[in-house]
Amino acid sequence: MAFWNEKTLAQMSTQEWESLCDGCGKCCLNKLIDDETEQLYYTNAACLLLDNKAGHCQNYEQRFSFVPSCTKVTVDNIESLTWLPDSCAYRRLFMGRELPTWHPLRTGSKEAMILAGMSVAGKVTCETKIRDIEDHIVLWPMKDVE
């Protein structure tokens, strides 16, 4: 049986916890909240550390030094990180859901994730090149497939 089915999030080792991240890059997208409706919107404006072609952080180990606003997902804050997409493994497991069939832990590679359209790779622009972020609102990051 897979470790994510045997253990709670709190019981996982650091290595197990880190391996839950599928590397989709959706958490690295700039998000907007409508002041009137409090609706969350994703944009295709990505963190300056995100490799736009590969869809992952270019300096993951030192990301907090370069981007102090970067959020570290932990067992202690997962409940409050409601902005994480429903496809996020941390969020899915916290909500009592299974990892999707395309998840790298289940398939052995990121290829199925990319084919399922779950990665930001090739779909984003660096935030430093964006002028009017409202023009970059997108719906695809909210997509969740089993």
Curated annotation (Swiss-Prot):
It holds the Pfam family CxxCxxCC. Coiled coil: none annotated. It comes from the Bacteria. InterPro entries: Puta_zinc/iron-chelating_dom, UCP006173. Disulfide bonds: none annotated. Belongs to the UPF0260 family. This is UPF0260 protein Shal_1839. It comes from Shewanella halifaxensis (strain HAW-EB4).
